A protein has these predicted regions:
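A short, N-terminal "cap"/entry segment at the start of jelly-roll beta-barrel domains
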Residues: 1-29, 140-143
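Hydrophobic transmembrane alpha-helix bundles
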Residues: 2-7, 13-14, 84, 105-114, ...
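Glutamate identity and glutamate-enriched acidic tracts
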Residues: 21, 77, 85, 93-96, ...
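A generic helix-loop boundary/linker signal
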Residues: 23, 44, 124-127
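N-terminal regulatory/effector-sensing and dimerization cores
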Residues: 25-118
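Amphipathic alpha-helical segments enriched in hydrophobic/aromatic residues interleaved with Lys/Arg
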Residues: 109-150
């Protein structure tokens, strides 16, 4: 689905899923995903959203305020946050990024351990397979008619 969010450019798209009760109970599951092209000044603020966010910056830069810290995420980097915490991000320049919101199993219980030991900012060169999986998830949602949970 093409987005009309303020600050997004043509070619931006996103997809939502409604997982089954079994998926919620037993799996990690996709909630939404997308590929955005944005202009300088695109921003997003939430006090609470019940899902996890994995966002990869392909081009440009995003500034993120999260857990009392400010981060600059540049091309080739990604952030991973628990959106149950207040967060704000914006693009101080044109930007291209991919994202997924997901949930399930013990996401919110294990995240504090990840954040404590590694923070929320990572580089693609350290996790190239994650970026390929992210792009594949978005491609499947864009091109395939039916998505299964299996």
């Amino acid at each position: 689905m093409h987005t009309t969010d303020t600050g997004t450019l043509p070619g931006s798209d996103y997809y939502f899923h409604t997982p089954s009760e079994d998926a919620k109970k037993f799996f990690y599951y996709l909630v939404s995903c997308g590929h955005y092209h944005t202009i300088n000044g695109y921003s997003f603020h939430r006090d609470f959203y019940p899902y996890m966010l994995f966002l990869y910056v392909k081009g440009g830069m995003i500034r993120l305020d999260y857990m009392g810290n400010s981060y600059q995420i540049r091309a080739g980097e990604f952030f991973f946050i628990d959106c149950q915490e207040k967060h704000f991000y914006y693009t101080p320049e044109n930007c291209e990024f991919y994202y997924i919101h997901f949930d399930g199993l013990n996401c919110h219980q294990i995240y504090p351990l990840i954040y404590k030991n590694f923070g929320c900012l990572f580089h693609q060169k350290d996790y190239p397979e994650l970026i390929q999986i992210l792009k594949r998830i978005i491609y499947i949602n864009r091109e395939e008619q039916q998505i299964t949970e299996a």
